[in-house]
Amino acid sequence: LSMPGEQTPWAESSFEEREVIHKKYRDYTHGLLWFLKTDPRVPAGMREDMAQYGFCKDEWQDNDHWPWYLYIRAARRMQGEYILTQADVITSTDKKNVIHIGSHYIDAHHVTRYAVDQDHYINEGRIWQEGVPFDIPYGVITPKSEECENLLVPVCASTSAVAQCTIRLEPTWMHLGEVSGIAATMSIKNQSSVQDIDVAELQERIKAVGIPLKQLSL
């Protein structure tokens, strides 16, 4: 379960500090489930429904049936040769050096929670916007040349927080990972930096393995 406001320190925290954050999430989730099951302020029908749920008996048996790791939806991202933004996935969707086509909508979770009074709050930051197919350019997976010349980043790619929501799915990461492998072999073979490979040749190799680069090919 999301805990708006508590996620911000994670990326910069030590392992010990992350354990504290993890415990906060566990305590919050445990408390919320107990509240929904037992508190008289909760409608009786909802309490009855929630009373039917419990922890999975055959999972994480050595950890009180809780997952060992906190699910991290997003944390650090590279600032690369090109930063993919909300505009790139909504309006300026065509890119000359395209290496893959994204299509997922923007589904940003709540970022902050504000208390209105003793019984009410407002969540902020939620975006649920249907998108369109958009080009993902090569610069999104390459670092700035002055910082590194032999690195390709298909997962923690160079995107804004909003654009990251649209490429964070495994099918997209799988294709970007495959593209990274192709680009890496070209860089090694040509003894060049990853920024200096021939993107047109890369595109031909991408298409040769069955990854479409034109939206009409989907």
Please name every model-derived segment.
Residues 1-218:
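Flavin (FAD/FMN)-binding glycine-rich loop and adjacent Rossmann-like elements that form
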